[in-house]
A protein has these predicted regions:
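Conserved class I S-adenosyl-L-methionine
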Residues: 2-54, 67-71, 90-93, 231
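Conserved Class I S-adenosyl-L-methionine
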Residues: 6-9, 19, 31, 39, ...
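A generic alpha-to-beta junction signature in SAM-dependent methyltransferases
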Residues: 50-52, 75-76, 149
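Class I SAM-dependent methyltransferase SAM/SAH-binding core
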Residues: 57-116
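Conserved hydrophobic residues forming the short capping helix/wall of the S-adenosyl-L-methionine
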Residues: 76, 98, 176, 199, ...
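A short acidic, Gly/Pro-enriched loop at the edge of an enzyme's catalytic core
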Residues: 114-125
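A short SAM/SAH-binding and catalytic strip from SAM-dependent methyltransferases
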Residues: 124-138, 161
Length: 279
C-alpha cells in the first residue's frame, strides 16, 4: 500500500491514523535508525521471550519501519513475518530495507490491527515492541489479536513503565516545559494489574509481566543528541519566546552533557516485558 491508500480504521483510532500517517510517521521514518538504536538494548530480552522458531508465522503489531519484523523473519527461516502499522511512510521504508537486506519471508500491510480481518488462528507468535500502546479501544484490539493467534500461540509485548520511572521522558518533558506546567500524561499498558485484567478479558491466559531496565541511546555526542531531542519536541519549543527557548535549549544541552559517556549519550529507561498465551 502507498501513503495515499485509504486505511479502514476504527473511529477510536482516527487520531492515531492522522498522526502516524502524517507528521509523526514522517519523523519516525526519517529517524528510524536512531529510534531503533535508542531501544537496541532491549532486543535480546525481547526476542528471547518471543522464542520464535524456524517454522513460526509471526505478526508484528505497530511495526514502524520494520526492524523487529525483519529480525523476526530471520528467526522464522521456514516461516514468515508480517508487520502492520498505520504509517504508510514507515512501511514504505520497511519494504525497501527488507529488499536491501535480502529478507524474503517478510511482508508489511498498512492496517488498523484493532479491526483488521487477520486470518483466524493465522499466527504462532504476536509481538510488539512499544507499538501496542496506541489503540483507541484496547479490549477490542487485543480480542482481535487473540482471534488471529493459534491456540497455544504466544503474545510478547514491550511497553513502558510509568513516566516517573523513565528518566528520559521526565527529563525532556520538564526541561522543554521551561517553567510551564508539564502536561499530564499516562502511558498505556504501564500498570501491570490493569494490563493483566485487559489481556485476560480479551481472552489470553498465562499472563506474565517482567520489569526490564535498560540504558536508552540518544546520540553519539551532545550536538547529535540535542538535534534528535529538539526535532521530536519542536512544537513545544516553538511556543516559547526566543530568550526562553534559548534557555531551554541550553538546559537541555547541559543535561545531555551530564549523560555523555564514551559510547554516546544515554538515559535510564524502564519497560515491561509482557507475555501471555491464547488458550
Amino acid at each position: 500500500m502507498s501513503e495515499s491508500t485509504v486505511v479502514r480504521v476504527d473511529p477510536s483510532n482516527e487520531r492515531m491514523l492522522k498522526a502516524w500517517n502524517g507528521d509523526d510517521g514522517a519523523l519516525w521514518a526519517k529517524r528510524a535508525e536512531r529510534f531503533n538504536d535508542g531501544v537496541a538494548a532491549y532486543r535480546d530480552t525481547f526476542f528471547s521471550a518471543a522464542g520464535i522458531q524456524p517454522g513460526d508465522r509471526v505478526l508484528d503489531v505497530g511495526c514502524g519501519a520494520g526492524q523487529t519484523t525483519r529480525d523476526a523473519a530471520r528467526l522464522a527461516t521456514a516461516g514468515s513475518a508480517l508487520g502492520v502499522d498505520l504509517s504508510g511512510e514507515m512501511l514504505g521504508l520497511a519494504r525497501r530495507l527488507a529488499g536491501e537486506e535480502g529478507v524474503p519471508n517478510v511482508s508489511f500491510e498498512q492496517v488498523d490491527a484493532q479491526v483488521h480481518a487477520f486470518p483466524e488462528a493465522g499466527f504462532d507468535v504476536v509481538i510488539s515492541r512499544h507499538g501496542s500502546m496506541f489503540f483507541g479501544t484496547p479490549l477490542a484490539a487485543f480480542a482481535n489479536l487473540v482471534r488471529a493467534t493459534r491456540p497455544g500461540g504466544r503474545l510478547v509485548l514491550l511497553t513502558w513503565q510509568p513516566l516517573r520511572l523513565n528518566e528520559w521522558i521526565t527529563t525532556f518533558r520538564t526541561i522543554i516545559a521551561a517553567g510551564r506546567e508539564v502536561p499530564s500524561a499516562n502511558l498505556a499498558l504501564s500498570d501491570p494489574e490493569e494490563t493483566e485484567a485487559l489481556l485476560t478479558s480479551a481472552g489470553y491466559t498465562d499472563f506474565r509481566c517482567t520489569a526490564v531496565n535498560k540504558p536508552m541511546y540518544f546520540g553519539q555526542d551532545v550536538d547529535d543528541a540535542a538535534d534528535f531531542v529538539i526535532e521530536q519536541h519542536g512544537g513545544r519549543l516553538s511556543d516559547l519566546d526566543e530568550a526562553t527557548r534559548a534557555k531551554a535549549v541550553a538546559a537541555l544541552r547541559a543535561d545531555l552533557a551530564e549523560h555523555q559517556t564514551d559510547r554516546g549519550v544515554f538515559y535510564g529507561s524502564a519497560a515491561w516485558l509482557v507475555e501471555a498465551r491464547r488458550p
